[in-house]
């Protein structure tokens, strides 16, 4: 037993010594290749996810996008929390409009919208004059989408759309938006992992989906408040012409009844308050 113990101790000392020597000469133990690390990572998810991931890589290659290097990037991950977020969205939790308003802090936003409008009044007025969209409605959109530009999401849109696809959540949306996202990044020379989004992949203060960024975003800076305000007005103007009303344009922004009522009511409150203060 003593001899066995001494042998084990000697092996351990040799291994420690080897690690010390490598550190001393500035060498680190060899890291696994990207392919090997990818296998390790994907082994942590269900086999069905690996299948979906492989089919997605093949599909995207056919569309002209080689996403192998993105999948192998250490910043890539399949985000399990996205499933929970979709299941617990405010639209699913709210039983009526009053509850929806409580979830989105309507009473606080009645005050915050006035502060936002005062801070961005010149650009809101320009957008209203150019596109014919009331400045209060534009401001209300920012209120519900990004709490008046206080946040733009903590997720990565590439991870979000890939996660949605492999987990079977709104796959009909995920793949087209993933393609639009990669088009946007290619066109603007942006590293996709530098972007932040909501859990549903909506980007910046206006919370545009990638397809909307490509069609309706005006300007060069995703995080310019002026560019975001102009782009929201541009979007609403287009869809008001198609739908025939401002309410229908807001519905195109988010096709949920509670969302539309929240935006329209908040805009009306702001308009009434501003009219009374003049």
Label for each model-derived stretch:
Residues 1-172, 180-190, 195, 211-278:
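Cell-wall glycan-active module
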Residues 197-208:
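Extracytoplasmic ligand-binding site segments that recognize negatively charged/polar headgroups
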């Amino acid at each position: 037993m003593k001899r066995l113990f001494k042998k084990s101790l000697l092996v351990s000392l040799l291994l420690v010594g080897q690690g010390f020597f490598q550190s001393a000469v500035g060498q680190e133990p060899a890291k696994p290749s990207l392919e090997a690390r990818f296998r390790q990572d994907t082994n942590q998810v269900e086999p069905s996810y690996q299948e979906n991931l492989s089919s997605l890589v093949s599909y995207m290659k056919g569309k002209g996008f080689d996403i192998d290097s993105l999948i192998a990037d250490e910043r890539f991950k399949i985000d399990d929390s996205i499933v929970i977020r979709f299941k617990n969205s405010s639209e699913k939790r709210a039983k009526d409009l009053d509850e929806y308003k409580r979830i989105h802090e309507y009473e606080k936003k009645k005050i915050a919208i006035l502060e936002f409008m005062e801070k961005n009044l010149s650009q809101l007025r320009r957008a209203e004059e150019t596109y014919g969209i009331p400045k209060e409605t534009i401001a209300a959109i920012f209120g519900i989408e990004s709490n008046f530009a206080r946040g733009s999401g903590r997720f990565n849109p590439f991870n979000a759309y890939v996660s949605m696809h492999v987990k079977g959540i709104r796959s009909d949306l995920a793949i087209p938006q993933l393609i639009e996202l990669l088009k946007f990044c290619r066109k603007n020379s942006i590293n996709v992992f530098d972007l932040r989004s909501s859990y549903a992949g909506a980007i910046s203060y206006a919370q545009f989906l990638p397809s909307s960024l490509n069609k309706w975003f005006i300007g060069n800076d995703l995080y310019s408040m002026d560019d975001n305000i102009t782009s929201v007005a541009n979007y609403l103007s287009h869809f008001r012409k198609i739908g025939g009303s401002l309410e229908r344009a807001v519905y195109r922004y988010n096709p949920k009844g509670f969302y539309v009522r929240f935006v329209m009511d908040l805009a009306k409150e702001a308009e009434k308050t501003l009219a009374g203060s003049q």
